[in-house]
Amino acid sequence: MTDDQKRELGKQAYAKAMKYELDYGCCPQCVLATVQETVGIVDDQTVKASHGLSGGGGLVGEGVCGALSGGLLALSAKYGRDRNNLDKGRYMNNFKKAKELTERFRAEFGGVTCRELQQQFTGRTFDMWNAAEYKAFDGARGNKCAHATGTVTQWVVEML
């Protein structure tokens, strides 16, 4: 696939992932489902397993943004170490790809944790386990989380 074809596929993936996030939520699943449908390297079990990573992990905000987590999982689906190769080295190429994605994400969005992005996107953080706070977050963020989800998906598709 040429670089131009990858960029075009990335743009399509951006739009699909953004729509999924706006329609369904759960940013890591939206990234992975779109990567699965676009380039086919992610299986259903990985999409399912990513569910708990949303909202920085368990909706607590302290961990890595779910969209970034989904992107890292997608890269690892292609470049990561298989179970039967645990004793075969560190697979540094995967770490390099993951580092590249993480650094690009931080530069674009001003942080990597869900809370950092909440602060960047809305000027404050929220308790997503409090119904009123979650509703306030959902309104305040607009399409910014969906944009982050689409952006990560686009980058990952272009990196694969």
Question: Can you describe what each PLM-predicted range is?
Answer:
Residues 1-23:
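Polybasic, low-complexity association/targeting segments
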Residues 57-96:
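Helix-adjacent hinge/juxtasegments
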Residues 27, 65, 114:
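Short cysteine clusters
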Residues 19-23, 30-41:
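Long, hydrophobic N-terminal alpha-helical segment
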